[in-house]
Amino acid sequence: MCISSYNYNPIIPSRRLALFHFASSVIAIPHSQSVLSGIKGSELFRVQEANAAEKNLFEWIKNDNRRFLHAVYRVGDLDKTIKFYTECLGMKLLRKRDIPEERYSNAFLGYGPEDSNFTVELTYNYGVDKYDIGNGFGHFGVVVEDAAKAVDLIKVKGGKVTKEPGPVKDGSTVTAFIQDPDGYEFELLERGLTSEPLCQVSLCVGDLDRAVVFYQKAIGMQILHRKDNPEQKNTVATMGYGPEDKNTVLELTYNYGVTNYDKGNGYGQIAIGTNDVYKSAEAIQLCGGKIIREPGPLPGINTKIAVCLDPDGWKLAFVDNADFLKELE
């Protein structure tokens, strides 16, 4: 019922007492005040309900079965890159496919089966033999038993070494840096045997605190460690879905004073497995991320995905876990 200011007659309380219900001692509340209280109460209920739903969503993210599936990037000569990765880095070619109607081919390589290991997905677009990597992509990390031996082999095979093997500053781990035929950089880390040799993806960000919060809340990662390096003028946060010695991690690097990066057109995205792409997309939007492909099945293969951009514009694709396993059958 609408209450009009023209026909509403408020009760004016006496000097001694407002209207008093003699039997129950209950103070009568003017009708307009009770309606307003009801409106405020319903609004409060809706806010509380929304907050509870948001809390439940972020709790779901913590328990979602997430892991890194693969990194996607473009190469100018697929066969040449496959040869380099298998002969110099010890990867295995897991599968390869050609899509002539869309004028591209791709290959998946890694150190173990795709259903349990992180891999790289190389994409070759017909007729394109060179890509701009930009300055925002950092490197991939690969665990090796002997960095010096690995570097010697890469030199023999004609690979480019950008940093000779040596211990990291303030540490004992021996590392080296090399480039693949397209200029993508790989850090070789001398460590013990691991179930996940393709251990790291490094990206540059313009605001580390903002990025860490986004990857924690929206993407469900844990911050494993954070280190400030004044001599190198950068701060690095390492994030992932489990211990660094058993899982691939994401390394976010903030270089002092640099807030924007050229991402080029070579590096594509990281794919992450999830039990529900729709809930994943909802969480990303709540945290300020941008959805660039709405959640739903891909034409032809029916694998459900959702694609978003993080606050720095790096692309992430969420892939339905069950659908991904069906792809591998």
Predicted regions located by residue number:
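N-terminal secretory signal peptides
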Residues: M1-P13
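Vicinal oxygen chelate
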Residues: C2, L17-D64, R97, G141-V142, ...
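Residues that mark the N-terminal boundary/hinge immediately upstream of a DNA-recognition element
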Residues: S14-R15, A211
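Core segments of cupin and vicinal oxygen chelate
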Residues: K62-R66, V72-N117, V156, K169, ...
